[in-house]
From Swiss-Prot:
Example GO molecular function: structural constituent of ribosome
Job of this protein: Involved in the binding of tRNA to the ribosomes.
Assembly behavior: Part of the 30S ribosomal subunit.
Native organism: Dechloromonas aromatica (strain RCB)
Listed name of the protein: Small ribosomal subunit protein uS10
Classification via HAMAP family: Ribosomal_uS10
One GO location term (cellular component): ribosome
Length: 103
């Protein structure tokens, strides 16, 4: 796998889970001899929703909800076959979405 890099993008609602997963990926990649760039925290996406409290009247009375999506980006430069195998075997928490691209 000469002159290739792996780009990993993590997405989660809980920042603690995403930081823990990023740390596990960095440790695994460094253990196999690859060079890791990151994790780079990307801007947090905030979705806001306004919901009526009452089903009938009181239009002015509303609940405001927010969902925050945290993102991290990592590049693994010059990965070996051992690096790819170790990343495939890595067990990450269920709340973390992982996108892996070979470039």
């Amino acid at each position: 796998m000469a002159n290739q890099k792996i780009r990993i993008r993590l997405k989660a609602f809980d920042y603690r889970l995403i930081d823990q997963s990023a740390q596990e990926i960095v440790e695994t990649a460094k253990r196999t001899g690859a060079v890791v760039r990151g994790p780079v925290p990307l801007p947090t996406r905030k979705q806001r929703f306004d919901i009526l409290r009452s089903p009938h009247v009181n239009k002015a009375s509303r609940d405001q909800l927010e969902i925050r999506t945290h993102l991290r980006l990592m590049d693994i430069v010059d990965p070996t076959d051992k690096t790819v195998d170790a990343l495939m075997k890595l067990d990450l928490p269920a709340g973390v979405d992982v996108e892996i691209k070979l470039q």
